[in-house]
Amino acid sequence: SLRSAIKQVASGRFGVTAEYLVNADEIQIKIAQGAKPGEGGQLPGFKVNDVIAKTRHSIPGISLISPPPHHDIYSIEDLAQLIFDLKNVNPQAKISVKLVAESGVGTIAAGVAKAKADLIVISGAEGGTGASPASSIRYAGISPELGLLSLTQQTLVLNGLRGQVVLQVDGQLKTGRDIILMALMGAEEYGFATSALIVLGCVMMRKCHQNTCPVGVATQDEELRKRFHGRSEYLVNFFTFLAQEVREHLAEMGFTRMDDIIGRTDLIERKSVELKSVEHMSVEHKSEAHIPNPKHTLIDFTKMLARIDNSAAIRHVIDQDHGISTVKDVAIIDAARDAIEHEKEISLEYTIANTDRAIGAMLSGVIAKKQGARGLPEHTLNVKFKGSAGQSFGAFLVPGVNFKLEGEANDYLGKGL
């Protein structure tokens, strides 16, 4: 599997294996998408070529449909279990959860923080894929500002949870000023997608799902892909200029570090709107004058910009404790070192309790990191358990590892096989 800094775990789980998960610095659980919250996704069959089919463990030409919900997440406890599973497979990776800016997202974000996510993404309605339905792009979700500040940041600070998580935001961010504003509202990381695509040549035809992208950005058609002229240097330049603009804004404000302005809503000043008289203007000049709407003066931002004064952290200050240093896999990995390193056949036996969760996940991650997708030769590592297995027994197990359980198992048995 090619290595990416961030890899997603979406509802379809296509190609989500131990090898996929260990080759990442951050694993993102995508609960929803800003452009089309609650709708799932679909990759049409004519875009599923041999490479994509192999990567996603599917068949070329067959449509890949991701349902709206994750079928192993129906509560915060279920989400906590998935976060625990992923952290076991790749202990070095940060686990993030992507939410959409909408009414009630603050309460959900508080639950996600309690589920021990390292990072929470608030995705604004303005961004998203060109393959989304036009009605969803236009009407679903709310602005990232509302979702981030008045819902998520304030709720997390109020409940003393803000210091445990990193907040990331996305949704049509384009300039250094956008980054500064999002930082003042509480975000520590900032996502760019559409603007980065445009830098690489995207012309916003919104035909990503039709395989007919005229500039070769979002198509598997070999002839159309020849039209792609994007280069990595373009992205480097774009983000360099973006960082420079952020630095200039910080200097204007009298700060030297981004950390110093995270959550500082007291630094946000409302623009004074001067209402111009338009009676003397012609119709043509009125259309060009950009006259502000007088209703703007009636909007009260007091609650939105209020700072919660409860002595709680307003930015990330401490990492989550995932409690993975004491899992049973640590002992199994130590005992199975010859099998992992030298592929010697080994048999082990352990008692197990229902508090032993995600047995095999960390073991599989270690093997996948060393051996890749092929795992170990058949029947190399054989482990017998007696007792009542906890949740996610045998999750993401790699080839060559055989588990035998004498007893019963709980939810998510063999997840990700």
Q: Model-found features: residue ranges?
A:
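Terminal amphipathic helices with adjacent charged low-complexity linkers/tails
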Residues: 1-16, 22, 46-47, 98, ...
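Glycine-rich phosphate/ribose-binding loops and adjacent secondary-structure elements
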Residues: 1, 70-226, 356, 360-361, ...
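Mobile "lid/hinge" segments at catalytic clefts and subdomain interfaces of large enzymes
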Residues: 17, 21-60, 186-273, 288, ...
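Short coil/turn segments at secondary-structure junctions
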Residues: 63-70, 135-136, 226-230, 347, ...
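Active-site-facing alpha/beta catalytic cores
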Residues: 1-85, 89-96, 101-112
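Charge-rich, low-hydrophobicity low-complexity segments
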Residues: 294-417
